[in-house]
């Protein structure tokens, strides 16, 4: 079996159906004995250029180990699904399991946002304590 990196873009109006699509596509690969090494749902993002007058799409990245036949079946499923705007399948030399730069940046943003929220809550608590002490 070979290793592949797969990216597909879904129509933004179909974003709520992405989890079902991911489940179906990973099922195609795993039923044929394939293995999913990395699966990242990047969410709705800006496109570099308009596709069918759309400026945003829902991005999904997968790194898999699968047979060529199952990857061909997956590409056919992409082709016949109108919600999939674009797809790209690239063969890679090995399994890629670490988080992509996009996922790392998203995790850092979420961590920074949660720490800012925590510090804001702590500031409110200390202000309330100071007010209570002043009374």
From Swiss-Prot:
InterPro entries: Ribosomal_bS6, Ribosomal_bS6_sf, Ribosomal_S6_plastid/chlpt, Transl_elong_EF1B/ribsomal_bS6
Gene3D superfamilies xref list: 3.30.70.60
Keywords, ordered alphabetically: Ribonucleoprotein, Ribosomal protein, RNA-binding, rRNA-binding
Gene Ontology CC annotation, any one: cytosolic small ribosomal subunit
Residue pairs linked by disulfide bridges in the UniProt entry: none
GO MF: small ribosomal subunit rRNA binding; structural constituent of ribosome
Stretches the record annotates as Disordered: 96-135
Compositional bias (Acidic residues): 124-135
UniProt keyword annotation of Membrane present: no
Keyword Ribosomal protein applies: yes
GO biological process per UniProt: translation
Biased composition range(s): Basic and acidic residues: 104-121
Family matches, as SUPFAM superfamilies: Ribosomal protein S6
Described function: Binds together with bS18 to 16S ribosomal RNA.
Family named by the database record: Belongs to the bacterial ribosomal protein bS6 family.
Designated name of the protein: Small ribosomal subunit protein bS6
